[in-house]
Amino acid sequence: MIQVLLVIICLAVFPFQGSSKTLKSGNVNDYEVVNPGTVTGLPKGAVEEKHEPMKGNTLQKFPLCTTGPCCRQCKLKPAGTTCWKTSRTSHYCTGKSCDCPSYPGNG
């Protein structure tokens, strides 16, 4: 009786911890799902793309930046590129951020 109670408590606390399923393609996937029959398989060795590749000014696979005065075509502008100019001073991109240091739009 105690064993049955322990099993019931264990199932209540840890109802489903995931499983591995070998797909028709031969790939083994680890996942947590309620209905394993709904998983679609990929060809063996294939990787599912989550992002569209960049073409021109569209998205790239892993964009470094999307907008900002130090961003151009999803890439950071080189360090030293002028990003903001006033009559008294100029500000330059760092090459590490899409934001311009001391740019009024950052605040």
UniProtKB/Swiss-Prot annotation:
Tissues expressing the protein: Expressed by the venom gland.
Protein name, entry field: Disintegrin lebestatin
Gene Ontology annotations of biological process type: angiogenesis; cell differentiation
Motif (Cell attachment site): 85-87
Organism placement in taxonomy: Eukaryota, Metazoa, Chordata, Craniata, Vertebrata
GO molecular function: toxin activity
Cleavable signal peptide: 1-20
Compartment(s) of residence: Secreted
Record-linked InterPro entries: Disintegrin_dom_sf
Quaternary assembly: Monomer.
Keywords for the protein's UniProt record, in alphabetical order: Angiogenesis, Cell adhesion impairing toxin, Developmental protein, Differentiation, Disulfide bond, Secreted, Signal, Toxin
Organism: Macrovipera lebetinus (Levantine viper)
Cysteine pairs bridged by disulfides in the record: C65-C74, C70-C93, C71-C98, C83-C100
Start and end residues of each Disintegrin domain: 65-105
